[in-house]
Regions:
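Adenine-nucleotide phosphate-binding core of ATP-dependent small-molecule kinases
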Residues: 2-5, 9-44
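A glycine-rich helix N-cap at a beta->alpha junction
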Residues: 71-77
Length: 125
């Protein structure tokens, strides 16, 4: 199986949506790994109250959020498919009966990098 996707996640998503099996497998593996780590942290913390999707993929990729939450359904995670269709808007996307609140929280990664860089430059003087 040949992977014909670049490293940019939206290209991977587009490939998966166009039927590229390798891209679909890579996306599924990504979602599985995210859910695995959330599950591990939930076990270590004796449960979670909130699951937050943020940054480029988390705040914009409807399919990733749906797949990750489906993997976590054993914990009572339930999302509203209509609300999950939103991108880049701060909001709760879980259903009222979900045992875990699921949020989308936008971030400005470039601004954070610029602020951290400015702090490092100041500290180096």
């Amino acid at each position: 199986m040949e992977i014909i996707c670049r490293s940019v996640f939206r290209d991977l998503e587009a490939g998966a949506n166009e039927g590229n099996e390798a891209c679909a497998l890579a996306r599924e593996k990504f979602c599985y790994e995210v859910a695995k780590y959330v599950g591990a942290y939930a076990a270590a913390l004796n449960g979670i109250d909130v699951l937050t999707f943020t940054a480029g993929v988390g705040e914009n990729d409807v399919n990733v959020r749906a797949a990750v939450c489906e993997y976590l359904s054993f914990m009572g995670v339930k999302i509203d498919p209509e609300l999950n269709g939103n991108r880049g808007k701060e909001m709760v996307i879980s259903t009222p009966d979900s045992k875990v609140q699921v949020w989308i929280v936008p971030t400005n990664e470039e601004l954070m990098i610029a602020q951290d860089t400015a702090d490092l430059v100041k500290a180096a003087k």
